Amino acid sequence: MTNNQICLPRRVPDIRITTISGPLPAELFSGENHMNALTRDLVKLVNITEENQAAKEHTSGAQFREKLHLMPPVGWLNDPNGLCQMDGVFHAFFQYSPFNAEGGVKMWGHYTSTNLIDWEYKGVSLYPDQPFDCHGVYSGSAFLEDGTMYLYYTGNVKLEDGDFDYINT
């Protein structure tokens, strides 16, 4: 290859679409085309962490939760993403790290509302489950076409030299 040639990948990576319907069960991600064992356990850990936080708030601390602003069940919220309305329901996705209030492994949390005042938490919608997003599901957006919601995001990979590969070059 000479210096003035452009090398293109032989195959464009598949675009994955996540259907939104609440917390994702760990069984959904078995098989070679889905998550590895570490990510499967991450799904379980997110569910356990959120259940423990809900139990704590039931007995104490609920009066300190936000009423009009979105607040994750536990951990860290950042970068609202994919704000849209579909079939009369508003959707708000956000970067989410349930294990550390300072950030950490990034996922996408999901809230819905019919009036933009009362929001219902729907769980984690996107987990880092592929080699091209193994260190986090970063910011992106959503768009609607023909009654289908499409989510897209930036996959994060931390390289051995400490740099980040945001565009999978």
Question: Each predicted region: which residue ranges?
Answer:
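Residue-level detector of intrinsically disordered, flexible termini
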Residues: R11, G22-P25
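Ala/Thr-enriched low-complexity intrinsically disordered regions
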Residues: T2, T18-T19, A26
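Basic polycationic patches enriched in arginine
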Residues: R10-R11, R16
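Intrinsic-disorder-associated, low-complexity terminal segments enriched in Asp/Asn/His/Tyr and depleted
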Residues: N3-N4, D14, N33-H34
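Beta-rich carbohydrate-recognition and catalytic domains
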Residues: P25-G31, M35-T169
